[in-house]
Amino acid sequence: MAAQYPAQMNFLAPRKPEDGPTFYRSAAAEGFETSNFHQEPYSVTVTDARPQRDSFQLDTHGFAFAVDPEGSQPEVLEAIRAGDKETVQKLYYPLVEKLIKDHTGASRVFIFDHTVRRREASLAGKNPNGREQPAGTVHCDQSPLGARRRVYQHLPEEADELLKGRARIVNVWRPLKGPVLDWPLAVMDCTTLQKADIHPTKLYRGRFELRGETVSISHNAGQHWYYLDRQQTDEITMIKIWDSKDVAGHMCAHCAFQHPETPEDAPLRESVEVRCLIFSDE
């Protein structure tokens, strides 16, 4: 039987119908609130996925694991750690593109973003060098509206034609140091996510300048969580963000969590997450 561990995760707090749709506003104009929701911690159980690592499927569970030694070559990892975006795009993006095509059968992959994270216990948001902290709130990066908006944002001339086929967003997450002992990444089995748990959250700037739409997640006791114990740098996690096709694994809520058995001297987690638009003729 796979090992299971207790964890705390932050979910969207219970809401009433009169509260309206959730939103977050950056650089809020005077007199405008930053958000109309808050998060609450819940206790969850996280199961070690390693005994069944190769059984998870993107189109069923919303996530999958894969072994990718090419992307974990020392020179590649060092370039990512150094934060040189041009070098990362030149060295690492082609490897991710090939990986995604091999695992999804996609005819085209467009990488639009990547984030490097290094946990620093004394910081809540970003390190001084701009690297983000692990995300401790349960979320999914894009709603269906936000995802389609991304297609038009990055590929405006081709968007209408591309969206006639199957379109997806998949994030590729990789540790930059292994094994991961500190704040590992947890992913939720999409088959245990209920429609009522999903809350599209508009992202405004200023007053009502729409910048995108993400997804907040509320808690229910039937949700199942997994993580890959002692994940190594050659092991990647693919996270489904959105899928235009009606499949069981249409999205994957995810969150970093504090493992109860993390050694006191564990190296602080470092990771890279690459965000991919994926297109196929289906």
Q: Where is each model-derived feature located?
A:
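Active-site loop/lid in soluble adenylation, ligation, and acyl-transfer enzymes
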Residues: A2-P6, L77-A79, R275
